[in-house]
């Protein structure tokens, strides 16, 4: 009798196990932590995550959730804002076709290759500080970019920014940048942070006519003449930026002439903050 009972139960148990496995396999989101956050946001705690359901995801904010794998996020085609800072992400290839993304925050992950975002043409804001990025050429054709935050990486070449005419905030502290020549072709930057780099020549900044904050602490700057000339010219003319400029300069090997140069900057309205 017991044997007969087990014989009847076994098919049922097998069916339950099979159903459970199918349910698990049905999820298009590989990372369980990411899946859990997506389910919370779209209010689908149970059941299969169909492509139709994933189209309801417009904003994904899940910082510090131990997320490692983005596989499956490519099905969230309507997503416009992604904030996944302070996770353990290394591969961002699943983002490559998410062309509706306008804001992307992946700070403090383990990302080295950003080529997959080269086609995100609506991107306006990118935050990738605290990663392992050395090549930023993927940004070159992202003409909608307004703000780039990529401090604490391994960047030495900033040529990619020379075509970004809408760029107003550029934050690249703690990198390996020495050549600012690409900045000579754009003129709408209001905030520029290049602290803790290897910059010596400020001449490429002479065409920046919208600057409000210039952070160049701890570089190799000995001569402020290009900045002085630019500010004096602005102050005696349109007064577009010099009277509003805040300058952070500490930790540079300033030469003997800089005492006079700093006085000239002050006379043009520039505030030296450090």
For every predicted segment, state its role.
Residues 56, 78-79, 99-101, 121-123, ...:
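Short "repeat-start/strand-capping" segments in structured domains, especially the N-termini
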Residues 139, 146-209:
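Eukaryotic tandem repeat interaction scaffolds
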Residues 85-134, 142, 147-152:
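A generic tandem-repeat structural signature
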Residues 92-98, 107, 114-120, 139-142, ...:
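Tandem-repeat architecture and repeat-register "anchor" residues
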Residues 2-5, 10-83, 94, 116, ...:
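N-terminal capping/linker segments that flank leucine-rich repeat
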Residues 58-62, 82-84, 102-106, 124-128, ...:
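Conserved hydrophobic beta-strand positions in leucine-rich repeat
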């Amino acid at each position: 009798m017991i044997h007969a009972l087990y014989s009847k139960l076994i098919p049922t148990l097998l069916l339950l196990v099979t159903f459970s496995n199918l349910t698990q396999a049905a999820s298009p989101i590989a990372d369980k932590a990411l899946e859990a956050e997506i389910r919370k946001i779209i209010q689908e705690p149970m059941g299969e995550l169909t492509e139709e359901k994933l189209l309801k995801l417009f904003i994904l904010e899940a910082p510090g959730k131990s997320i490692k794998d983005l596989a499956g996020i490519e099905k969230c085609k309507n997503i416009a804002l992604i904030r996944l800072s302070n996770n353990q992400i290394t591969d961002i290839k699943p983002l490559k076709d998410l062309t509706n993304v306008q804001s992307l925050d992946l700070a403090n992950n383990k990302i080295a290759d950003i080529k997959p975002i080269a086609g995100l043409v609506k991107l306006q804001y990118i935050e990738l500080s605290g990663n392992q990025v050395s090549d930023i050429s993927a940004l070159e054709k992202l003409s909608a970019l307004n703000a780039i935050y990529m401090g604490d990486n391994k960047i030495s070449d900033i040529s990619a920014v020379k075509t970004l005419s809408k760029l107003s905030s550029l934050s690249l502290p703690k990198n390996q940048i020495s050549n600012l020549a690409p900045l000579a072709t754009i003129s709408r930057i209001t905030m520029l942070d290049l602290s803790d780099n290897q910059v010596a020549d400020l001449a490429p900044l002479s065409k920046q006519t919208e600057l409000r904050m210039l952070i160049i602490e701890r570089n190799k700057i000995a001569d402020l003449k290009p900045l002085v000339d630019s500010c004096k010219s602005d102050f005696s003319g349109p007064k577009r930026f010099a009277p509003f400029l805040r300058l952070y300069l500490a930790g540079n090997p300033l030469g003997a002439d800089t005492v006079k140069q700093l006085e000239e900057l002050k006379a043009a309205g520039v505030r030296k903050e450090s």
